Amino acid sequence: MPKVLEKLMIEAKESLSELKDNRKPSRATKYKMEEAGIGALSVFIMQDPSFLSHQERLAKGSSQHNFNGLFKCENIPSANQIRNLLDRTKTEECAPLYHNGLSLLEAEGGLAQFEFIDGGYLIALDGMEYYSSKALHCENCTIKNHKGVATYSHSVLCATIVSSDIKEAIPLVPEFVSPQDGHDKQDCENTACKR
C-alpha cells in the first residue's frame, strides 16, 4: 500500500498544479497553488483535528521532515495563506483530484479490498452545512425560512467508500447543495444524492 500512497501523492500534486491561480502575476508570489492544495490535503492525511494543530505539529522538526518526505513539498503556506489561495478556487477544478485518485486506486487494485456484495461498494453519506448567515448570501445559498426569518447557508453532501474491515475510507467528489438551473424548488440533500 505505501507504493500506492506514493503514486496517489504524485497524482494529487499533478491535479493540484492544474488549479487556476487567480492572483495577479508578481515576483513577490511565494507559494504555488499546488503547495496550498498540498497544505490543505495534508491536514486530512496526517489526521490533524484543525489547521492550527497541523501548523503547530509541523513547527516541530521531526514532523516537518515527515511532511517533506511524504508530500515532497518544501514550502508550506500558513492556514490563512491556504484559505486566501484556495477560497477563490472553483469547486469543479478540484474534481480531477478525486477522479484521478479513484482511477489510480482502481488500477492498482486498491479498491478490491473495499468490494462488498457482487462487486459493489458500501457508500457512507454525510450532509453538512459549512456556512450560515441571516444577512450575507449569494446565488448558491440554500434559503431556509423560519417564522419569517430567512437563513442562508451553504451545504454539501459527502460520499465515501467504506468497509467494516478497513479503518481508511475513500472520499468521492462532494456534491454541493445549491439552486439548480431550471428548477423552481430549492435543492436538498436527497436531490444532490441523485446527482
Regions found by a protein language model. Give the residues of each.
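Acidic side chains
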Residues: 21-22, 126, 189
